[in-house]
UniProtKB/Swiss-Prot annotation:
Residue span(s) of domain HTH myb-type: 193-253
Protein name: Transcription factor HHO1
InterPro entries per record: Homeodomain-like_sf, HRS1-like, Myb_dom, Myb_dom_plants, SANT/Myb
Compositionally biased tracts (Polar residues): 171-182
UniProt lineage: Eukaryota, Viridiplantae, Streptophyta, Embryophyta, Tracheophyta
Protein's organism: Arabidopsis thaliana
Length: 357
């Protein structure tokens, strides 16, 4: 920047530029003075730049003065030579004294300026030394602060551990029963006490639930949110409606799934009577009575009695056994058979034969 100023020919422009630079640097120095201890070298560089610009301004002013004096000396010298030829000129004592006084003033100003510079340098050195001492002290302070913080952390951790132990002891000592909506009670700590009680679905609430399902088209079409909006019950949540809807769907599926299983579970029981396989009628009638008493239906038709087997088991001695029974019972006038079905049929036949005879 100083080289650029030296290249400028106009002295007024040089002064204006130097003044602008000096003002800007002074503002920067004011900002840096806040951090003078941390940035001593920056302050020193800025002050040196300000002094350099001031010297540049003083140099331009002295050049102007020297130029004017040289011109005046040249003019006076030429005039003096001309006048010396005609009139002897004598220097007055007052002019000499004034020149001496001016020189003395210039010397004093120069000395005062040098003393100011020396004083500023000494101040900067002292401040720099102070900042170095502060830096050395700051390391020790930082280490002390770290130790203090570590001690505080350990103390706080110990206090927190004590508080947690006391709270755990209190929770173990306190046992409060928590009653639920189902009527059961159980001992528990604070966690069970904070749990939300299950909703008890009353008949009125279930009736509203069924009406909502009818309006929406059935349990497989309706959604929990739609059901809750139609029911309009305070405090009823979507989760509660969802759980109740799932239970209702399972309950609706049970009859259609259990009835065919019950049919298949009714096994056919047979009894061997006189070498003949005969179904056990008591078992079938008992099953029919139990089915009627229990009220199990298929959903469309009423209770049904298990049917007789379509095919009877075959036996090799079936014809021979019947002939033997006929020969034994021919004397009495009717057939006697060990099986109840055959005995009934033979008795009816003999009675009809007697009536005809």
């Amino acid at each position: 920047m100083i080289k650029n100023l030296s290249n400028m020919k106009n002295d007024n422009q040089k002064r204006e530029k130097c003044c602008e630079y000096i003002e800007a640097l002074e503002e920067e120095r004011r900002k840096i003075n806040v951090f003078q201890r941390e940035l001593p070298l920056c302050v020193e560089l800025v002050t040196q730049a300000i002094e350099a610009y001031k010297r540049e301004i003083s140099g331009t002013s002295t050049d102007n003065l020297y130029g004017q004096s040289e011109c005046s000396e040249q003019t006076t010298g030429e005039c003096g030579r001309i006048l010396d030829l005609f009139i002897p000129i004598k220097h007055s004592s007052t002019s000499i004294e004034e020149e001496v006084d001016d020189k003395d003033d210039d010397d004093e100003e120069h000395q005062s300026h040098e003393t100011d510079i020396d004083f500023d340098d000494k101040n900067m050195k002292s401040e720099w030394l102070k900042s170095v001492q502060l830096w050395n002290q700051s390391d020790a302070v930082v280490s002390n602060n770290r130790q203090d913080r570590s001690q505080e952390k350990t103390e706080t951790l110990v206090e927190l551990i004590k508080i947690n132990d006391e709270a755990a002891k209190k929770n173990n000592n306190i046992k409060s029963p928590v009653t639920t909506s189902d009527g059961g009670s159980g001992g528990g700590g604070g966690r069970r006490g904070q749990r939300k009680n299950r909703r008890c679905w009353s008949q009125e609430l279930h009736r509203r639930f069924l009406n909502a399902l009818k309006q929406l088209g059935g349990p497989h079409v309706a959604t929990p949110k739609q059901i809750r909006d139609i029911m309009k019950v305070d405090g009823l949540t979507n989760d509660e409606v969802k759980s109740h809807l799932q239970k209702y769907r399972l309950h609706a599926r049970r009859p259609s799934q259990t009835t065919p299983n019950n049919r298949n579970s009714q096994t056919q029981h047979f009894v061997v009577v006189g070498g003949i396989w005969v179904p056990q009628t008591n078992h079938s009638t008992a099953n029919a009575v139990n089915a009627v008493a229990s009220g199990e239906t298929t959903g469309i038709y009423g209770p049904m009695v298990s049917s007789l087997p379509s095919e009877w088991p075959r036996h090799s001695n079936f014809g021979r056994k019947i002939s033997e029974d006929r020969s034994r019972c021919s004397n009495n006038g009717f057939f006697r058979c060990s099986s109840p079905a055959m005995s009934c049929s033979t008795r009816t036949k003999t009675k009809d034969a007697k009536i005809i005879s």
